[in-house]
């Protein structure tokens, strides 16, 4: 049976079917993050039973995935460049003794979406529009005048749920090019005895990152073929009313894309600017998956605020699962 190819007409229909513009008012700039209520956060805190904190981030260094061989151009993204401004050698030499202190200092230069990160609502446009109908030209050389990531700085806290698709299918990792379906996600909920609730942050493991790390090479990871969400999962996302969604791949959706030539990342076209979904990519999920399998609990408190960089369309993060 041939897979359906997503066309421009499909995108047009989806843009109306899944549109959340105006749902939280004409001035809204944070989209589905509105789904998380104060009570949701209180209840998420009650999930903490053993005081264990699990990071879902890769380290930010020159060993990251950017620059690896890939079928897709990097669009200027590099791994972080970390530079020391003052070192211990400087201190030993007495460079700052005249100021009465010995210290080190440093700086980093990096694309904001080069590692574990959130895609902000100013990142992807649907034709000439961004989230909530704002003109795409609101994102200027000075940054996003609307939907900047700083608008979310008191968000990204709530109940997290891990859906471990490879575990359900009894494989180490999903094959590159495998499109995760609504049925896969529903099966994972049942398998893990967990139900996605309104306002949740849903983390979906494919195993691809772990496969790359095990192989000792990121080749093919940034923009290459990958397992990921199929276009049909927009139905599931809409139904569940989740606050955010993240995965362990470079771009969340299945690659090669299911779309006709000329349409790149069709799932993104709808999820971000039309639905207002904040999306996490390049999440490191091995430790969380192992812990969830050990205690058979796939829900946890999730804390992953973006850096409030004014006008940014994405942000590096250190997401935490607290159990």
Regions found by a protein language model. Give the residues of each.
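Active-/binding-site microenvironments in catalytic and ligand-binding cores
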Residues: 1-323
């Amino acid at each position: 049976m041939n897979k359906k190819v997503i066309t421009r007409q499909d995108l047009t229909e989806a843009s109306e079917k899944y549109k959340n513009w105006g749902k939280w008012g004409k001035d809204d700039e944070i989209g589905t993050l509105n789904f998380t209520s104060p009570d949701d956060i209180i209840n998420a805190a009650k999930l903490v039973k053993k005081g264990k904190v699990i990071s879902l981030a890769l380290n930010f260094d020159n060993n990251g995935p950017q620059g690896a061989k890939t079928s897709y151009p990097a669009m200027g993204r590099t791994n972080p460049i970390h530079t020391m401004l003052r070192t211990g050698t400087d201190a030993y030499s007495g460079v700052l003794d005249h100021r009465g202190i010995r210290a080190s200092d440093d700086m980093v230069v990096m694309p904001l979406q080069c590692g574990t990160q959130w895609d902000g609502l100013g990142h992807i446009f649907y034709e000439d529009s961004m989230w909530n109908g704002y003109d795409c030209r609101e994102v200027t050389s000075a940054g996003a005048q609307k939907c900047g990531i700083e608008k979310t700085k008191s968000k990204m806290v709530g109940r997290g749920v891990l859906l471990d698709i490879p575990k359900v299918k009894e494989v180490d990792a999903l094959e590159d090019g495998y499109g995760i379906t609504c049925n896969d996600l529903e099966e994972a909920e049942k398998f893990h005895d967990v139900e996605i609730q309104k306002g949740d942050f849903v983390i979906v493991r494919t195993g691809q990152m772990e496969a790359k790390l095990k192989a000792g090479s990121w080749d093919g990871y940034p923009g290459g073929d990958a397992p990921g969400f199929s276009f049909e999962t927009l139905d599931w996302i809409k139904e569940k009313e989740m606050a955010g969604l993240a995965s362990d791949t470079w771009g969340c959706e299945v690659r090669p894309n299911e779309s006709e030539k000329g349409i790149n990342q069709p799932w993104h076209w709808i999820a971000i600017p039309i639905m207002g979904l904040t999306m996490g990519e390049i999440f490191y999920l091995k430790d969380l998956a192992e812990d969830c399998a050990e205690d058979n609990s796939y829900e946890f408190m999730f804390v992953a605020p973006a850096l409030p960089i004014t006008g940014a369309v994405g942000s590096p993060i250190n997401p935490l699962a607290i159990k």
